[in-house]
Amino acid sequence: MKRQALAAMIASLFALAACGGEQAAQAPAETPAASAEAASSAAQATAETPAGELPVIDAVTTHAPEVPPAIDRDYPAKVRVKMETVEKTMKMDDGVEYRYWTFDGDVPGRMIRVREGDTVEVEFSNNPSSTVPHNVDFHAATGQGGGAAATFTAPGRTSTFSFKALQPGLYIYHCAVAPVGMHIANGMYGLILVEPKEGLPKVDKEFYIVQGDFYTKGKKGAQGLQPFDMDKAVAEQPEYVVFNGHVGSIAGDNALKAKAGETVRMYVGNGGPNLVSSFHVIGEIFDKVYVEGGKLINENVQSTIVPAGGSAIVEFKVDIPGSYTLVDHSIFRAFNKGALGQLKVEGAENPEIMTQKLSDTAYAGSGAASAPAASAPAASAPAASASEKSVY
């Protein structure tokens, strides 16, 4: 009896196992939608990884006009950024020097490139030779002061803080130690790009450009070392308005370079501290403008506003060779205060797009014969500046 019961029990177990195997064999394969949902869940889990468990990466940063390489990862990381404030005398213009206050030894400071969702850890050092404390306010950071209090650092000291890059865009960073305007006017600003998770479209060339206004005791061109003039700064009357900290920083031998047919992207900032820029490239139309460095895209734009403490991203294809002049189209700033740059483009001419001069003939004017004699001699126009002659 016991043997019969045991045999019956074993038979039932085999039957159950066979049934389970049959059910497993009949289970449907995972659908693409389910796979995508699983991948999305995994990505969400990665995005929510505590900062202490993220992979650690040292940021690749660049001096203007160079741009750090595009982000090629699809996950967040802890990105370490080292910054040093340095006060140093450098050339402002031919024969003119200025005592700049800088991030990492030049104006603008290095460009930083991170990914949306990254945790940015900033190691902020103030060179022992500095005369005053410095700090940094990241417009890309969410939280009081943008990190200014956390990075307030005396000469010869190092401070560390971190923030999460929550929103993609192109953002200014600047010193925010009082008097804030003076620190910015002396050159303490730069750009940080927070790439969207999906990245930016690939282009052929990228450049980093920041406009700034400078307030010197002497007038533009006055020789020697020029001190900062607070009265001119408060009155918003700069002697110099320049790209990348110096007259001619991206012109002549320092001109930006591209080839006909290439698409160019410019990351444009405005450190200010006072003036709003009307950024324009003479002879080009911006195919795309990421308005104020954000998500909104405008198309077919001739000039774009870049506010003080703000930015814009502009893209355009250069169709034909030539020297394309970058200006603040508040035009006296370009030809009389220094806001000029050059993009030199090589390649084959294309007369379908634009020809050279086809003719040059005499013209007497439609009303020349009956025009009355002038009652007074006409005032002569001032001679064109050297920069105007080189542009037009």
UniProtKB/Swiss-Prot annotation:
MF-aspect GO terms: copper ion binding; nitrite reductase (NO-forming) activity
Gene Ontology cellular component annotations, sorted alphabetically: cell outer membrane
PROSITE patterns, alphabetized: PROKAR_LIPOPROTEIN (PS51257)
Membrane topology note: Lipid-anchor
Further remark: Undetected during aerobic growth.
Role of this protein: Catalyzes the reduction of nitrite to nitric oxide (NO), probably with azurin as electron donor. Essential for growth and survival in oxygen-depleted environments. Can also provide protection against killing by normal human sera.
Reactions the enzyme catalyzes: nitric oxide + Fe(III)-[cytochrome c] + H2O = Fe(II)-[cytochrome c] + nitrite + 2 H(+)
Binding sites annotated in the UniProt record for Cu cation 1: H134, C175, H183, M188
Species of origin: Neisseria gonorrhoeae
Pfam annotation, one family: Cu-oxidase_3
Lipidation (N-palmitoyl cysteine): C19
Induction: By anaerobic and microaerophilic conditions in the presence of nitrite. Regulated by the gonococcal fnr and NarP homologs.
Region of interest (Disordered), residue spans: 30-49, 367-392
Annotated keywords: Cell outer membrane, Copper, Lipoprotein, Membrane, Metal-binding, Oxidoreductase, Palmitate, Repeat, Signal
Modifications after synthesis and translation: Palmitoylated.
EC number assigned by the record: 1.7.2.1
Name assigned to this protein: Copper-containing nitrite reductase
Assembly and binders: Homotrimer.
Domain (Plastocyanin-like) ranges: 101-195, 245-346
